[in-house]
Curated annotation (Swiss-Prot):
<comment type="subunit">
    <text>Monomer.</text>
</comment>
<keyword id="KW-0460">Magnesium</keyword>
<feature type="region of interest" description="Interaction with substrate tRNA">
    <location>
        <begin position="33"/>
        <end position="36"/>
    </location>
</feature>
<keyword id="KW-0808">Transferase</keyword>
<dbReference type="GO" id="GO:0006400">
    <property type="term" value="P:tRNA modification"/>
</dbReference>
<keyword id="KW-0547">Nucleotide-binding</keyword>
<dbReference type="InterPro" id="IPR039657">
    <property type="entry name" value="Dimethylallyltransferase"/>
</dbReference>
<feature type="binding site">
    <location>
        <begin position="10"/>
        <end position="15"/>
    </location>
    <ligand>
        <name>substrate</name>
    </ligand>
</feature>
<dbReference type="GO" id="GO:0052381">
    <property type="term" value="F:tRNA dimethylallyltransferase activity"/>
</dbReference>
<dbReference type="GO" id="GO:0005524">
    <property type="term" value="F:ATP binding"/>
</dbReference>
<dbReference type="Pfam" id="PF01715">
    <property type="entry name" value="IPPT"/>
</dbReference>
<feature type="site" description="Interaction with substrate tRNA">
    <location>
        <position position="121"/>
    </location>
</feature>
<comment type="similarity">
    <text>Belongs to the IPP transferase family.</text>
</comment>
<comment type="function">
    <text>Catalyzes the transfer of a dimethylallyl group onto the adenine at position 37 in tRNAs that read codons beginning with uridine, leading to the formation of N6-(dimethylallyl)adenosine (i(6)A).</text>
</comment>
<feature type="site" description="Interaction with substrate tRNA">
    <location>
        <position position="99"/>
    </location>
</feature>
<dbReference type="InterPro" id="IPR018022">
    <property type="entry name" value="IPT"/>
</dbReference>
<protein>
    <recommendedName>
        <fullName>tRNA dimethylallyltransferase</fullName>
        <ecNumber>2.5.1.75</ecNumber>
    </recommendedName>
</protein>
Length: 305
């Protein structure tokens, strides 16, 4: 038995295509999106509509509040529990989403995280504040392999890697290698040519604005959720917050959301290219109807193995 993970960049059309595919084969969708896990954040995360969720049951959406902590290890545990529930009911589970880190957690495994230590994190943040760039140098010295995989500007993951090293004396890159992979999964990636994908992203952002993204952000802030939360730094939310604070005008806000989403989509494609065994479908060149038929066949046949 092989379970499909259908990934790809934002706005490529995963949701619409997979709703139809899963409806016809009697499958249920397990969301693989690190932002759709949050309640109250609907428009900016492009959650499936209530009508779509009626057509095909979805899991791993709206599971925590915006101020709650969540990580890839927790996602793996919770989503596998959801998968087993779907299997017990005689249905086909299909993972759908664009969060590559979650795909990694499923396929390659993830070590059981070392508990967070706020004292260490506070010390590291203060060190970085006093001497910008010092944490990057420390990471390159203590864990060169992790340094090659963590972007120089990704302070959060840099601090986490150093925290693990300081608490255990072991490199996070070594611990991650000890994690057990799971051969029950196979990966399908939906993509489009850059010009078409970027056009779709621009249109999606315009639609989000029309649907009330600004009001959604205002409502979240009104509920007491801080702009400094990880959830509120999601693309679309952070730009609206800066707009509401008067840092730039409305048109600049829209421009930045589009630009940042395009950059994010490019990073997603790069991430999924790491899966050498993945099956790719380029929706710019392939007929979408034919791709849907191929997906149905591929998902069902692999599930029946």
């Amino acid at each position: 038995m092989k379970i499909a993970i259908v990934g790809g960049p934002t706005a490529v059309g995963k949701t619409d295509i997979m709703i139809e595919v899963c409806e016809e084969i009697g499958a249920e969708i397990i969301s693989m999106d690190s932002r759709q896990i949050y309640r109250y954040m609907d428009i900016g995360t492009a959650k499936p509509t209530s009508e779509q969720r009626r057509r095909v049951p979805h899991h791993m959406i709206d599971i925590i509040d915006p101020d709650e902590y969540y990580n890839a290890f927790m996602y793996r545990k919770d989503s596998l529990r959801a998968m087993e529930d779907v299997l017990r009911r005689g249905k086909i589970p299909v993972y759908v989403g664009g969060t590559g880190l979650y795909a990694d957690a499923l396929v390659r495994g993830i070590f059981e995280g070392v508990p967070a230590d706020e004292n260490i994190r506070k010390e590291l943040r203060e060190l970085e504040r006093r001497e910008p760039g010092i944490l990057r140098k420390m990471l390159e010295e203590f864990d060169p392999e992790a340094a090659t995989r963590i972007h120089p500007n990704d302070l959060k993951r840099t601090i986490r890697a150093l925290e693990v090293y300081m608490k255990t004396g072991r490199r996070i890159s070594e611990l991650q290698k000890e994690a057990k992979g799971d051969d029950r999964f196979f990966i399908i990636v939906l993509t489009r040519e850059r010009y078409e994908l970027y056009e779709r992203i621009n249109k999606r952002v315009d639609k989000m604005i029309e649907m009330g993204l600004v009001d959604e952000v205002k409502r979240l802030l009104g509920m007491g959720y801080s702009k400094d939360l990880n959830s509120m730094k999601t693309i679309g939310y952070r730009e609206v917050i800066d707009y509401l604070e008067g840092k730039y005008d409305f048109d600049k806000m829209v421009h930045l959301i589009k630009r940042n989403t395009r950059h994010f989509a490019r990073r997603q494609i790069i991430w999924f290219k790491r899966y050498k065994e993945a099956v790719w479908y380029n929706l710019t060149f392939e007929d979408v109807g034919e791709v849907k038929e191929k997906l149905k066949k591929l998902i069902v046949e692999n599930f029946s193995v």
